[in-house]
Amino acid sequence: MKLILLFSTVLFSFSALNQTQGIAYTAVGKGVATTFVTDYHCLGINTSALGWGTGYSGKHTTLGMTEFGFGVYSDAMNSAKLKKFFGAVKDQAFGTNPTPYDWNAQREAAGDYAQAGVSMFLNLNWFGFAYQNEKLGGIAFNVQENYQWYSKFNQQTTDILFRGKFSSYFDSLQIAVNGDTSMIANSANLSADTLNSVILGSISVPLKLSAITNGSEIRSVWNRYYNFGYGRKIFGKDSVFVVYGGVGGRFIQSMAMFNMESNESGLYMYSSVTPRFNIDYGNVALSNPSTIMQSGNFPKSVGNGYGIDLSLSAILFNKLKIAASINNIGQVVYNRNVYKVNDTLLTQVTVNGLSDYNVTQSINQLLRDGGLLSLQGEEKYVLKNAADFRVGASMDFGKIFTVGVDIVAPFDRSRPGSITNPVFSVGGELRPTKWLCLSAGYFGGGIYKSNIPVGIRFVLKNGAYEFGVSSYDALSFFMNNSNSFSAAMGVARFRF
């Protein structure tokens, strides 16, 4: 299944952001966002900042587009392997066809991913608008595309996903030669000709899926957000103490969702994926009440929902900003191509295993007919949003330097798209001239180790035009043992 083909193609046709900084490339290089973002960048982060104004005299309207970002993180794999993973995703996005992995390469890749947590996100801001006025407050709207992936597999699950019917889990292989079929013992010493004739792998004493996958999980979601928000001053004296409030929300169109966890309590899995990706579910699709077929060139959404944001902030002596917010409280109802798993014995599979380093393709190995999971169709599935709570503060030291801190925590880490644990960050921005902004910071937590974000931003004609580039971790460009690989960019932001 080409789960992120269309979305990735869109992103790379224009050439981030993890949810702690949203789509705001201006905040990525600092590692902090809650008290730094304004205009439409604050949607989903701190809508009360819409009441602060643009920060540029005489300019009330902000427009932006062509802002995007991506990032890949792991608690065990280094940046060289993560770049290899992202390269495989990019090859798929561009439609290039590298040489498929042979059995030895599949075995090596399985070893890399076993017990390794891997997180990836892709974000694109299609369009953003904000109008901010001291008397009326500020309103904002933007359209954002977001893809989130997190996976961690035990050794046996990884082996089956990458090697398919050739996995060491199976003790027998069925081969077809000149129209005749027979069973042979599975062995690491089989010839290439024999391996090419294998049609399925089977086991004489099978295990239940929950036993095979115990300790494994995948949480993935691809959503389109139509965000809106309003923020304004509530009370206070500008030069001493001012309190601002904000409210926001979003309409959510979901293109794909996969939520699986296997532990001592058993195996849990629900999925809903747009038919644009042509997953062959086999006969189970015929009895699924939520089955739909693809028509047209654009992928059909499989779920719709909403999210609500609430925020409060204060500015003291025009220097110290403090803010807290709750974001994305709500849910998405999936009612198309909805499936759940049956915890049955795994006796055989017919899939070949992953053909490259792109682990997101494992969803195809899990869902398709002849794959790892036994499926049952469902009418609908309700998924609570990946909501978060955040607090932040920052201090302005004149017009030259600002420093701040952020803490972002998930409401429920089990929801697809959620950060796994609280993330702490500290960072700042240096403005040596009116047109140049340099930023750096630190963040850690979640599945992330120590990361050093950096960024550079150019602001021309008193904020009339702005562009810049940032990275979530500068060390990844210089050290092979770094645990991340990322970038964010914006090339078209205007104020007037």
Language model features by range: what are they?
Residues 3-14:
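Sec-dependent N-terminal signal peptides
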Residues 19-496:
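Subset of outer-membrane beta-barrel
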Residues 1, 18-19:
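Absolute protein N-terminus
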